[in-house]
Amino acid sequence: YAAVTAMYVAAFLLSLGVAGAPPAPEKKAHPLADLREAFEYVWRKPDLLGPFTLAFLVNLLAYPFVLGLLPYVAKEVFAAGQAGLGYLAAAFWSGALAGSLVVGAARLPLASGRAMLWSGAIWFGAVIAFGLTSTLALGLALLFATGFVHSFCITPLAAVMLRSSEEGMRGRVMGVRMLAIWGLPLGLLLAGPLIAGIGYVATTALYGSLGLLATLAIGYGWRRALWHRSAAANAAYAG
């Protein structure tokens, strides 16, 4: 807890160096009207709708296995107990931290649109592989790698949505992006009966396969906006 608190304090202190911006003119509008306008704006732009759809998919089909279902996996699959659960959670989030540091260092010339697609596809593939794993050591390695790849999906995804939005719409667009988390409780709600009915391994295979196919469909359907190297979404990512 002390380390987490220290990170929050450090983040706050670093935020003090962010350049200020002149206040925008006040605009009186109903919050629901703003939300509807944001959804309509995202719906009209493939370079926003694609990332939003992918964000919803990873919440629906990928995050459940490293969040709500991880205690089940630790107990029923790895027979690891409380300590094993801690190791599993730490493996994923340590990988995510390492990936975030690599992305944030801006040492790699990432094409953000392509990066979020290929890393999303690898992430869903890792869900399938994790479901087939019954060895704790291999599970830890897979979770670390998954967390690492996860950062190459989520961070560029946010960059694409910010870059593709007009300045006056960025706040509302990112608000819509946050609503993608609604996929997580839905994914968890569906996973319970599926695991009871068809088993854990089949459920991970189903979730991972659906996510992988949907990611490929996003990349193909909106390839001009997200995959082509000339697309604005693939301008050099500066971290």
Show which residues each predicted segment covers.
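Pair of pore-lining "gating" transmembrane helices in MFS-fold secondary transporters
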Residues: R44-Y63, F144
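C-terminal transmembrane bundle of multi-pass solute transporters/carriers
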Residues: Y1-V9, L13, R36, W43, ...
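A generic secondary-structure micro-motif detector
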Residues: K28, L60, A180-I181
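Short helix-kink/termination motifs in transmembrane helices of multi-pass secondary transporters
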Residues: P51-F52, L60-V73, P156
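Conserved beta/loop motifs at nucleotide-recognition and modification sites
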Residues: A11, V18-A19
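Juxtamembrane intracellular "pre-TM" segments in multi-pass secondary transporters
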Residues: G20-T53, Y237-G239
